[in-house]
């Protein structure tokens, strides 16, 4: 790519926004040119806005330190500076849905880390190795939004990204029942041990909302586009327990699968 795409980060001062900035440092395709956050951060440099709340293991990239934070609600102004945005905003689901579609309607593609649009029927939730064909639904979404270029696309819940690709590879053996237990790091809650010391040497055996996501979202990944919307698959039946563990980064999953056509060890 001869010229990098100009990227904006919505919700740039939060932990997920910081992760985007860290991962995109020196990226061969993308350059972070705009950071946007709440009105209380707007007008400050990114370094000033984040202050002592930088939570990444690596230092804050020099390229973003002096970027002036823009008000996330000044949609037209933010959109005019970028080719597309990554969304990591921390709002209610209805607010997230609304503001992401506002950006899309300015002809700015939105790639969202949030769960708000994961069940919007014409919004693709994609793991490229599993369901790249779901990007085709974007054309129907554009018609609904009245856009030529703008759209919203989302990623699935982090807890399923380890085992959903494996289950996809085993579809020929017709899995019909899946029991999974996920052991999820505190970074998934936007925390570090510094601001959540209670998690040291501790386990929380239930994470509100995570079980439903882990049980339903794989079915959407395996769904099909019909009449301009994504219709989720109905099998396998997935049962999941989600446990918060005292680990800073990285999730683990223990997954048990029943097949209608039992594979051999070699086939697996």
What residues fall within each predicted segment?
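Charged docking surfaces used in two-component/phosphorelay signaling
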Residues: 187-268
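N-terminal Rossmann-like NAD(P) cofactor-binding subdomain of oxidoreductases
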Residues: 1-205, 237, 265
